[in-house]
C-alpha cells in the first residue's frame, strides 16, 4: 500500500503513535488492519506493507518525523532518517522510489523546497536509481512524491525550474514509468511524454471542488489535458486506486470511488485504458 503523503494534520498535538490522535487513527484504521509481510516481502527486505512519500503535513510541527518513524519504523531499514526523507526498494520486478518535495511555503505552496536532501541531490539520486534499474533490466518504475508535477486545481503544480518531469520522462523509452502525487485535494491524471501521472488527493481530506477558489486554476492553452475529469469541473470525490502489476504486461489501474452527491455514489473506473 502506497500513500503520497499528508495522512495526518500536524504534530502539534503529539508526535508519536502513542501521543498523536492523528497517527493513532492511521494506526487503527490502516496499519493494524494489514496482514504481516509474507516471505516474499521479507526476502525483499520489506518488513511492512505500507509506504509513504512524506508530505508537508507529516513534518508540520514534527520536523524530525518522529510520527512517521514511530508508525512505520521499518522505513529506517530503507534509509529514512530525520535527515534523509527519500528511499527506494525493488519488489517483484518493479523499482519503487520515494522522494521528498518539501515542507510548504505559503508564498509558493507547491514549490519543491525539500531540503533532506535538496532538489538537485534528489534528482541526482533518482537518476542513479533509475539507471541502476535499467541496468538490471527492471521494466517498471513507480515514483512517489507529494507535490504534483501536473495539476489544474487547488495549490497548483510544482513550478519551474524545479519540476522533475523532463528528467523522469527521459526514462520512459526504456521502462514503464508511473508517478503518484498528492497535495492537491482532488483527482487528476495525465499521460505526458510517455509518463503516467496520477494525482491522488481524494483519500479523505475535504475536496478542493467544494472549497471556494480552489476548483480550478489558470493554465496555458497548451497545458496537458486532465484525463480524469476530461475538461469538466472536478467534483467532490473520495477514492483509491488498485494497481495490477504483471511481468511483461501493461499495468492496469482501477479507481474505486465514492461520490456523496451522486445517485450512484459508489463506482469503479479503469484508468489509462
PLM features per residue range, with description:
Residues 10-135, 156-158, 163-178, 184-244:
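Extended active-site neighborhood of metal-dependent phosphoesterases/phosphodiesterases
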Amino acid at each position: 500500500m502506497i500513500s503520497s503523503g499528508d495522512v495526518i494534520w500536524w504534530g502539534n498535538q503529539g508526535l508519536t503513535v502513542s501521543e498523536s490522535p492523528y497517527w493513532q487513527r492511521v494506526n487503527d484504521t490502516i496499519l493494524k488492519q494489514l496482514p504481516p509481510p509474507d516471505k516474499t516481502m521479507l526476502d525483499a527486505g520489506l518488513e511492512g506493507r505500507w509506504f509513504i512519500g512524506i508530505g508537508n503535513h507529516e513534518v508540520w510541527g514534527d520536523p524530525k518525523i518522529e510520527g512517521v518513524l514511530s508508525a512505520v519504523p521499518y522505513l529506517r531499514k530503507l534509509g529514512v532518517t530525520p535527515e534523509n526523507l527519500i528511499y527506494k526498494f525493488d519488489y517483484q520486478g518493479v523499482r519503487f522510489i520515494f522522494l521528498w518535495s518539501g515542507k510548504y511555503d505559503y508564498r509558493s505552496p507547491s514549490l519543491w523546497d525539500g531540503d533532506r536532501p535538496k532538489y538537485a541531490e534528489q534528482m541526482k539520486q533518482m537518476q542513479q536509481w533509475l539507471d541502476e534499474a535499467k541496468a538490471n533490466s527492471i521494466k517498471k518504475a513507480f515514483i512517489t512524491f507529494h507535490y504534483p508535477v501536473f495539476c489544474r486545481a487547488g495549490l497548483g503544480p510544482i513550478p519551474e525550474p524545479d519540476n522533475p518531469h523532463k528528467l523522469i520522462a527521459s526514462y520512459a523509452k526504456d521502462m514503464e514509468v508511473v508517478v503518484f502525487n498528492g497535495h492537491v485535494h482532488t483527482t487528476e491524471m495525465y499521460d505526458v511524454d510517455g509518463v503516467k501521472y496520477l494525482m491522488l488527493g481524494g483519500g479523505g481530506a475535504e475536496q478542493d471542488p467544494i472549497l471556494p477558489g480552489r476548483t480550478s486554476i489558470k493554465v496555458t492553452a497548451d497545458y496537458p489535458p486532465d484525463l480524469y475529469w476530461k475538461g469538466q469541473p472536478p467534483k467532490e470525490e473520495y477514492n483509491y486506486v488498485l494497481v495490477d502489476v504483471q511481468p511483461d504486461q501493461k499495468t492496469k489501474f482501477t479507481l474505486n470511488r465514492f461520490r456523496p452527491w451522486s445517485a450512484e455514489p459508489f463506482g469503479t473506473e479503469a484508468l489509462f485504458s
